Structure formats: structure tokens, C-alpha cells
Amino acid sequence: MNPNQKIITIGSISIAIGIISLMLQIGNIISIWASHSIQTGSQNHTGICNQRIITYENSTWVNHTYVNINNTNVVAGKDKTSVTLAGNSSLCSISGWAIYTKDNSIRIGSKGDVFVIREPFISCSHLECKTFFLTQGALLNDKHSNGTVKDRSPYRALMSCPLGEAPSPYNSKFESVAWSASACHDGMGWLTIGISGPDNGAVAVLKYNGIITGTIKSWKKQILRTQESECVCMNGSCFTIMTDGPSNGAASYKIFKIEKGKVTKSIELNAPNFHYEECSCYPDTGTVMCVCRDNWHGSNRPWVSFNQNLDYQIGYICSGVFGDNPRPKDREGSCNPVTIDGADGVKGFSYKYGNGVWIGRTKSNRLRKGFEMIWDPNGWTNTDSDFSVKQDVVAITDWSGYSGSFVQHPELTGLDCIRPCFWVELVRGLPRENTTIWTSGSSISFCGVNSDTANWSWPDGAELPFTIDK
């Protein structure tokens, strides 16, 4: 090959390489442009990702699927149809309680970033269930956990996190500044009620889908407080009960009807010998039933039921299987307050089925330890202490605490009835475990089923003290 041929050959190869390089660059530019277009596309665009569709509603991601394209998370969304939770169905027939969730938050918090909390509760929309809780503005195993045995402080807030997960700064959503709270979903949006402020002038702030819609001022100036569990929504209206007045004597109790976060009606109960605190409420066949805490003089639980016009009935659970703590040993009951060991109390719940009642209670009648569910087939109206079913949930050697009801509507479950459920708070630390400087809790929950269930103990299980306590 002569020199001219060599030059021509080398030149041809160089041109070919240049053309190939140019084509690769053009392809890369097209790829980057296409990726950018996907990422910045309209939020209303619907994408199919492994045959799963993500739903976006009211600024809350309901179902998540992430697809990695060039190391960038792309989320597709579309509107989800809202419904109106009717609450007209009856409670599902059940024979026992199946374990639903356990968050193990104290165990996880010994090493991870987990909030110091109390008063957890669960509430469900037609799409999902969420855990709500009152944080102390502090993390477990941190210096700010010191002194969190205190109930009311300006650092407390109502927050929510996915069901069954330990509440942390990474998975939790702020709802309201509050040291007493409630929340519920009407099928279109979340109503939250957060009470904060001084004991003699606290205010309940109402929010609907995160926007302040109203306030309720303390009317007795004696620690306005509410349920510490879910409110009840039926046919577009939500209902809650608040207490204002002494915790050891007659107080004032009001039912509020709320629509899209605004109070449309309220009444004060005429209940001079009753005491209602921290009510656990649920819908049943178009009415609201609330089972509450008598902190004044009853070791059996008071109840109030009302319709959507706020016409109400009141009473005490008659059964000799007493539901409060402290309480006497089971004996002859009463449809009025049972005053033996009636002072003080703990938040709890029951479910009424005709003349029968499922009673949730601590296993200990003096300490907040253990938990059990008891079916008394005549206990709503009869005063004997006979029962036919007892299901163990937490052993008497392990700490429990508050408990409360929540329900799953047919719009969520696909059933033709309202499924009854409950949660139990498992409190650890002060005041009973004085090797710690803090007070917090984890939680478990159960739902009613008409099939086989287990008798066991699902305790908190954390080993104390923590590093911060030593």
C-alpha cells in the first residue's frame, strides 16, 4: 500500500468513527430529553408500572409504586373517587378477635429514631387505615425524652403514620398541635381534632384535609378534653364527644356534629350522676354508640348512644364483669355506677350486640397489666357476672394501658357489615418502671372475625432501661 492509499484509509476510518460517535451523542441527548419529559409530565397523567396504578387523593399518596429510570423515581397518579361512608350497616357477627397489627415501637426505638408517644389510636377511611398518636416532641433514648410522663405540654402533637409501623420522623405526618385528640374520615376527607393550650383556656382546633375549619373553646375552663380514639362519620357528618370539668366529680359533656370540619350542631348531656371521659365510639345501624371512662365513681363503664339529630340515651353497662381499672372482683353488677373501687379509671371500650356485650379490659383489677376480651351474652342488660367466652391478648405479667375501638366500613372491606376492631396501648417507663426517665408506648390491634382465633400474649417486649436511663 503506497503512502497515498494509507492516508485515504486512515482518513476513512477516522470519518467512520466520527460518524458513529456523533450518532451515539445524538441518541444520548434524545434519551435524556425523553427521561426529563416523563419526570416533568402532567400530574394527571396515568402510567402503567408493572400493572399497578398509583392513586393520588387529597395530597396523600394512597398506594405507592416507584419505577427507577436513570436513577430517578417517577410516580404516576390519578384521581380516586370519593364516597360517603353511610354507617347504616350493622356490626359483623363475630366469634373472636384476630391479631391485626403490632408495631414494636419501643423495641425498635432502643436503637432507631422512634417518637416518644402515648394515646395511639387507629382510624380507617374507605381506602386505608392509619395509626394516630400524640408525640411528646422527642425521640426514645434521647435527652428530650426526660419528663415525658407529663400529659399536657406545648410540645405534644397529633401525628399519623402507616398502620403497624413504628412512628418515626421518616414515616410520620404532622396533623395538629395537641395533647388531646381525635380523627376520622367521612369518605371524602380526614377530620382531625386537636386540643392544646392552658388548662383553664384550652382550644380544640378542627381541621378538614389539613386546613383549619373551626375552633371550640373550653367552656368550663377545666381541661377541655376529647376521645383519644376515632370519631364517627355517617352520611357526611362526623360526631365526637368532649368533656370539660372535674375528673373526680360531675363535669360537662357535649356531643358535636361536624360537617367538612365545621360544627353544625352541639348538645350538652343531661347526665348529673354520670361521668364521661375518653369515649370510644363506633357506628351501628345508623346510630353512634360510645362507651366511656368514669373517672369519678364507677368501676363499670358508662355509655351514650345517639342518632344523627343528636337525640340520645344514656346508661351504664349492667354486667357484673366490670370493664374499668381499678375495679372490684367480678360480682353482681348494676345498671347504675358501681361505686366499689370506682374512683380513677382507664380509657377502654365495649361492643354492644343486642343484650350481649364484648368487654375489653385489663387482666389485673388494680394495675394496667394484661388484657382480655370477654363475651357476656346478656351483659348489656343483666347484672350477673356469667360469661361464655374469654380471649387472652396480653398476659397479666405484662404492661398494657389505654384501649379503644375502631371500625372498618363495608366500603373498605367489601363486606356487608361494619367490622369491629380494637387497639391496646402497651405503656412502658414511668411512673411504674422507675428505672427510666421517660414514658412511651407501643400498640397492638385486633379485628373481629367469625373464624378461628388465638389465645396468647402479644406484649411490648422491650428490655429496659435504655442507654439514656443509665
From Swiss-Prot:
Key word Glycoprotein present: yes
Molecular function, one GO term: exo-alpha-sialidase activity
Location of the protein in the cell: Virion membrane; Host apical cell membrane
Metal-binding listed as a keyword: yes
InterPro entries given in the database record: Glyco_hydro_34 (IPR001860), Sialidase_Influenza_A/B (IPR033654), Sialidase_sf (IPR036278)
Domain of life of the source: Viruses
Family matches, as SUPFAM superfamilies: Sialidases
Catalytic activity: Hydrolysis of alpha-(2->3)-, alpha-(2->6)-, alpha-(2->8)- glycosidic linkages of terminal sialic acid residues in oligosaccharides, glycoproteins, glycolipids, colominic acid and synthetic substrates
E.C. designation(s): 3.2.1.18
Cofactor(s), names only, from the UniProt record: Ca(2+)
Keywords: Calcium, Disulfide bond, Glycoprotein, Glycosidase, Host cell membrane, Host membrane, Hydrolase, Membrane, Metal-binding, Signal-anchor, Transmembrane, Transmembrane helix, Virion
Chain spans, region Involved in apical transport and lipid raft association: 11-33
HAMAP family, A to Z: INFV_NRAM (MF_04071)
Miscellaneous remark of the record: The influenza A genome consist of 8 RNA segments. Genetic variation of hemagglutinin and/or neuraminidase genes results in the emergence of new influenza strains. The mechanism of variation can be the result of point mutations or the result of genetic reassortment between segments of two different strains.
Subunit-structure text: Homotetramer.
Function: Catalyzes the removal of terminal sialic acid residues from viral and cellular glycoconjugates. Cleaves off the terminal sialic acids on the glycosylated HA during virus budding to facilitate virus release. Additionally helps virus spread through the circulation by further removing sialic acids from the cell surface. These cleavages prevent self-aggregation and ensure the efficient spread of the progeny virus from cell to cell. Otherwise, infection would be limited to one round of replication.
Protein name: Neuraminidase
Lineage of source species: Viruses, Riboviria, Orthornavirae, Negarnaviricota, Polyploviricotina
